[in-house]
Amino acid sequence: MKATIVFLLLAQVSWAGPFQQKGLFDFMLEDEASGIGPEDRFPEVPELEPLGPMCPFRCQCHLRVVQCSDLGLDKVPKDLPPDTALLDLQNNKITEIKDGDFKNLKNLHTLILINNKISKISPGAFAPLVKLERLYLSKNQLKELPEKMPKTLQELRVHENEITKVRKAVFNGLNQMIVVELGTNPLKSSGIENGAFQGMKKLSYIRIADTNITTIPQGLPPSLTELHLDGNKISKVDAASLKGLNNLAKLGLGFNSISTVDNGSLANTPHLRELHLNNNKLNKVPGGLAEHKYIQVVYLHNNNISAVGSNDFCPPGYNTKKASYSGVSLFSNPVQYWEIQPSTFRCVYVRSAIQLGNYK
């Protein structure tokens, strides 16, 4: 009886299943020899089934997270666990995403491909990712946005690439999209198709900063709450370009070349709370601030503003229903602070919220 028990224990040790990582930072392989010499012979037994999916070599797998970052990979690893929810492939040397690279990853929610050398993505590469919500492709060499992105996608970040075109067709059917980040690309206004973003009914956040665009993109969706266009070459704010943006709460237009803000522009954004127009070429305070009901933060520093009127920011009189300002910056403008009437800021919440300074 004892001999039988010893035989079974030895058989289990000798024919152990293949290596499986049990934790995110567990790279240690158990000793496969287990003290059994080559002269030992046992009858053949069926190979034990692995307890779970294999983890790609050198990657770390834990709780449906597969981390393969900073490994010098030049292609997507094979045999990825089918239950993977987050796949991190950032900081590698991958040059191409091919059809079949993500096959069987039907549970993937987040795909991180930041800081690779990707210049080509096959049209059907993302087709198997039927639950993908977040796609990070920043710091690569893409010239166009990928085609046939999953309809479940909510967040797309593709800044610091070589994108020159944004076609309306690439966003068709992406009705769940909330965030689009396209900053730091050699993109021009002519490269953005009119109404390219219009079909995304839930889109809330767009950032197209540090590009070569000269105008605010046309046909933006009314669902937008944040629009960041800082660091471009925009010279004028057109009232028509902001028409219909009834839900916009934050507008970033700093570090452009804006000299004019059309009358009525701010009226087209009735729920705007924060306006960044710093580091431009404005020679006066934009019209419409005093009548705007909700705006609370206005950045106008580093412009060419030489005078500030007593009704530029607040409605006439002290009995006003306008929301109080919590921040107004006017420093680094030609206007001298002692030339501004104290009543100019009668609707500012606290005096410390006003930033004035000498022009340099």
Swiss-Prot record:
Cleaved signal peptide residues: 1-16
Protein name: Decorin
Transmembrane segments: none
InterPro entries: Leu-rich_rpt, Leu-rich_rpt_typical-subtyp, LRR_dom_sf, LRRNT, SLRP, SLRP_I_decor/aspor/byglycan
The organism of origin for this protein: Sus scrofa (Pig)
Cysteines joined through disulfide linkages: 55-61, 59-68, 314-347
LRR repeat start and end residues: 74-94, 95-118, 119-142, 143-163, 164-187, 188-213, 214-234, 235-258, 259-282, 283-305, 306-335, 336-360
Keywords for this protein: Disulfide bond, Extracellular matrix, Glycoprotein, Leucine-rich repeat, Proteoglycan, Repeat, Secreted, Signal
Entry keyword annotation includes Flavoprotein: no
